[in-house]
Amino acid sequence: MSKEDMIEFSGTVTELLPNAMFRVKLDNEHMILAHTSGKMRKNRIRVLAGDRVNVEMTPYDLSKGRITFRFK
């Protein structure tokens, strides 16, 4: 799947889950399950509950996503 096919949303991390998973509440009130992207893991960017994040999702499964950016 190419990068152009991904859908981007903004949201807030509501819950930290095991195995580096997060529950994210999107701005459109949907709750999804998300994990951090590889570059965020490599650069050790911490994500905590309450952080504003960008999430990219595939159009095939709108219940899971990947956190690509954490706002300051």
Swiss-Prot record:
Gene3D superfamilies, A to Z: Nucleic acid-binding proteins (2.40.50.140)
GO molecular function annotations of the record: ribosome binding; rRNA binding; translation initiation factor activity
Keywords annotated in UniProt: Cytoplasm, Initiation factor, Protein biosynthesis, RNA-binding, rRNA-binding
Localisation per UniProt entry: Cytoplasm
SMART domains documented for this protein: S1
UniProt domain S1-like: residue ranges: 1-72
Chief place of localization: cytoplasm
Signal peptide location: none
Cellular compartments per GO CC: cytosol
Coiled coil: none
Function: One of the essential components for the initiation of protein synthesis. Stabilizes the binding of IF-2 and IF-3 on the 30S subunit to which N-formylmethionyl-tRNA(fMet) subsequently binds. Helps modulate mRNA selection, yielding the 30S pre-initiation complex (PIC). Upon addition of the 50S ribosomal subunit IF-1, IF-2 and IF-3 are released leaving the mature 70S translation initiation complex.
Assembly: Component of the 30S ribosomal translation pre-initiation complex which assembles on the 30S ribosome in the order IF-2 and IF-3, IF-1 and N-formylmethionyl-tRNA(fMet); mRNA recruitment can occur at any time during PIC assembly.
Family statement: Belongs to the IF-1 family.
HAMAP family linked: IF_1 (MF_00075)
Protein name: Translation initiation factor IF-1
